[in-house]
Amino acid sequence: MPVGYSSDNPFQRERKLLGQTIKHLRDKGGMTQEGLAEKASINVSYLAKIENGYVNTTVRYLIKLARGLKVPVKALFEF
């Protein structure tokens, strides 16, 4: 079984990588979680869960985050 893979949660690795990428882009843009959450019109606690890989988010939220980060959606998947 690949590292980071769990039969209970087969997408755990990808969620973590997505969250790390969002955090990296946020840090690179000099934004706090609160700042990005405000720009993306999402709850800061939900953003924290996304960045930590704890939730399966939706395309809607990924679009909001990309807009808040001022990057194309595909940039969120460049990990």
PLM regions with names:
Residues Q20-G35, K39, K64:
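Short basic helix-loop element that most often maps to the first helix and adjoining turn
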Residues M1-H24, K28-G29:
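N-terminal flexible/basic segments that precede or flank functional cores
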Residues F79:
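Short acidic/histidine-centered micro-motifs embedded in hydrophobic/aromatic stretches
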Residues I22, L36-A37, L47-I50, L76:
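Conserved hydrophobic/aromatic packing and binding residues within compact polymer-binding modules
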